[in-house]
Regions:
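Boundary/entry segment of secreted carbohydrate-active catalytic domains
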Residues: 2-26, 76
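Active-site acidic/histidine proton-transfer and metal-coordination neighborhood
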Residues: 3, 7, 11, 28, ...
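Acidic-and-aromatic substrate-binding clefts and catalytic sites of carbohydrate-active enzymes
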Residues: 20-27, 44-57, 77-88, 113-120, ...
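Catalytic domains of carbohydrate-active enzymes, especially glycoside hydrolases
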Residues: 28-49, 101-103
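Short acidic/polar active-site loop segments enriched in Thr and Asp
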Residues: 40, 68, 104-105, 196
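Acidic/histidine-rich catalytic cores of soluble enzymes
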Residues: 41-42, 130-216
């Protein structure tokens, strides 16, 4: 019987609960669960939940439950296209304001959709400019090709894979790497110190992007 690989230990890395993991419950539930289950922090997914967009409400939840906010996930999903307006750079600047007000050091952002042409054209240098202006890490997340029947659709520009792009900070999502059939270990090794943030999940050989509630 093959001996299991030794676990990778990162003592200084906090383990956070994403508010997306408790959907359709609200961000308030994420803070409650994080406190009860012993998480170190919360990642706030800014979305259709009004609480997730309210700086003061999130600050109150963080203080009440004594759980810090470690990251803000910018509203860049299909279902959040109108959250904080429709201008992509405005959304990211608003995310930086929220992160700064809550003491979060990381903003998770997806690469642009192909139809966001002007945004996509300036995305790589624009992210670097935002980091320089704000002092906050904008960690671009790995995505995956969209599949329709037997065809693959490249929905993200410049790429769904951030490893080969000139980003200073990257988020690796293990659910996304599973859907794209990417080797996350190779991605981590290729990124080196550019790896800023990791989205954990329980992989179950599904072709769907799934964030599961993790109990540690």
């Amino acid at each position: 019987m093959q001996r299991p690989a030794d676990p990778v230990r990162v003592p200084s890395a906090p383990v956070a609960l994403s508010s997306a993991s408790v959907y359709p419950e609200s961000a308030a539930s994420a803070f409650e669960y994080a406190s009860r289950l012993g998480y170190d922090a919360v990642e706030v997914m800014v979305g259709i939940d009004p609480v997730s967009r309210d700086f003061e409400a999130i600050r109150h939840l963080s203080e009440y439950h004594a759980i810090p906010v470690c990251a803000i996930h910018a509203p860049c999903l299909l279902i959040t296209q109108r959250v904080w307006g429709t201008e992509p750079w405005g959304k990211l600047k608003r995310s930086a304001e929220m992160a700064r007000s809550l003491g979060a050091k990381t903003i998770v952002v997806h690469p642009p959709f192909r139809w966001q042409r002007d945004y996509a054209r300036a995305f790589v240098p624009g992210i670097a400019d935002l980091e320089a202006e704000s002092g906050i890490a904008f960690a671009v997340e790995n995505m995956y090709p969209w599949r329709a029947s037997r065809r693959e659709l490249q929905a993200y520009v410049p790429s769904w894979d951030p490893v080969g792009q000139d980003y200073a900070n990257v988020t690796i999502d293990l659910s996304h790497s599973s859907v794209s059939h990417s080797d996350p270990i190779q991605m981590v090794e290729a990124l080196g110190p550019r790896l800023r943030h990791v989205h954990m999940t329980v992989l179950n050989d599904s072709a769907k992007d799934e964030l599961l509630f993790l109990l540690f």
